[in-house]
């Protein structure tokens, strides 16, 4: 394990909904890659405890998805609150990436960052202000080279670590098939 300012921090959150004023984080996972997208380490995958009242505010899609994956039960049984999960994640990241050097990496990470800013501000501040958002490349490919889109299929498990691994693989796919070297 070696701290390196060129390493990239990948993150995914599962939430009870899309509004950080009302909804909450229920799972967080991170992993670190080198600049060439080789996975160096996977961080803790933590269900974040939320009250039954908070979970009761989820819409039908979230109830179905997070109950079906087993996440709701993991959230109810979790001993970790937002701050606990935040600190464990930061401790992992410190081993691999200096604070303030990695952009926040993943798919639609602007949404994740909104929740981090509200509920895990120390972790949000650990990232550089820039974004490495794979969904940007997907949108550009859809417009400029739509024939490549069928070549990458996501499993859409909506489990944080699975989703991050897919984001890394998706960026590698776009690097090979869309970005000219």
Curated annotation (Swiss-Prot):
Record bears the keyword Cytoplasm: yes
What does the entry list under GO cellular component?
cytoplasm
- What EC number(s) would the UniProt record show? 3.1.15.-
GO MF: 3'-5'-RNA exonuclease activity; nucleic acid binding
Q: Where is the active site?
A: 129
Q: Does the keyword Metal-binding apply?
A: no
Q: Where in the cell is it found?
A: Cytoplasm
Signal peptide per UniProt: none
Q: What does this protein do?
A: 3'-to-5' exoribonuclease specific for small oligoribonucleotides.
HAMAP family given for it?
Answer: Oligoribonuclease
Major location category of this protein: cytoplasm
One biological process term from GO is: DNA metabolic process
Q: Which family does it belong to?
A: Belongs to the oligoribonuclease family.
What is the official name of this protein in its record?
Answer: Oligoribonuclease
Q: Which UniProt keywords apply?
A: Cytoplasm, Exonuclease, Hydrolase, Nuclease
Q: Which residues form the Exonuclease domain?
A: 8-171
